[in-house]
């Protein structure tokens, strides 16, 4: 997912891979609702906070959301394999917020895991610093009378989930069009923000 909503599959460049190798990467397994796939997050050592935020969003925020938001993705979970690898990066050279990795383009980690388990493993990547700065509804956010730090935390959590679900839908339903998938993830973002702003800040989200 790009800021302008153009989706591409991207393989990190040589320099980015070399830098990640020098820094090292860590893995974390996330469990959520019983019908939701496990997420195996692979992240750079300086991405610990982003990995923890994704874990909280996927394992706690998403399952606790109201039925209207969750129903947008009712058909998603049965169409995905039991494990989805999520490669976290600060940013992508192409500017995309995330990519889905079609069969044959997975990382060595995902291929090795699929071989060891004996069944399919899906993979996506998320550019967490780019997602942090992404604000798809700036006027609605500005209309909430809250401290900037409070709104930034909520926006980041909602945006992480929206981009995650966007790329997972591309994996599960490769024939669905980008406008259809984008429309659903934007609607999810709006509903997620409305819920979180109401519950955590006691305010209304959006422009009256």
Language-model regions: role of each:
Residues 125, 169, 184:
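Functionally constrained cores in energy, signaling, and assembly domains
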Residues 175-208:
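Post-HExxH zinc-binding segment in Zn-dependent metallohydrolases
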């Amino acid at each position: 997912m790009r800021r302008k909503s153009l989706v591409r599959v991207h393989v990190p460049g040589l320099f980015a891979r070399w830098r990640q190798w020098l820094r090292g990467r860590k893995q974390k397994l996330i469990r959520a609702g019983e019908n939701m796939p496990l997420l195996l997050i692979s992240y750079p050592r300086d991405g610990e906070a982003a990995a923890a935020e994704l874990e909280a969003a996927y394992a706690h925020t998403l399952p606790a959301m109201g039925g209207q938001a969750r129903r947008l993705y009712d058909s998603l979970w049965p169409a995905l394999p039991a494990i989805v690898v999520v490669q976290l990066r600060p940013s992508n050279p192409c500017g995309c917020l995330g990519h889905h990795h079609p069969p044959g383009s997975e990382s060595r980690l995902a291929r090795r895991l699929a071989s060891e388990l004996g069944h399919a493993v899906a993979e996506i990547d998320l550019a967490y610093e780019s997602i942090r700065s992404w604000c798809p509804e700036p006027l609605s956010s500005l209309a909430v009378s809250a401290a900037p730090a409070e709104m930034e935390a909520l926006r980041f959590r909602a945006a992480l989930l929206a981009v995650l679900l966007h790329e997972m839908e591309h994996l599960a339903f490769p024939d669905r069009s980008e406008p259809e998938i984008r429309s659903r993830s934007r609607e999810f973002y709006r509903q997620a923000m409305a819920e979180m702003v109401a519950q955590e800040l006691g305010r209304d989200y959006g422009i009256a």
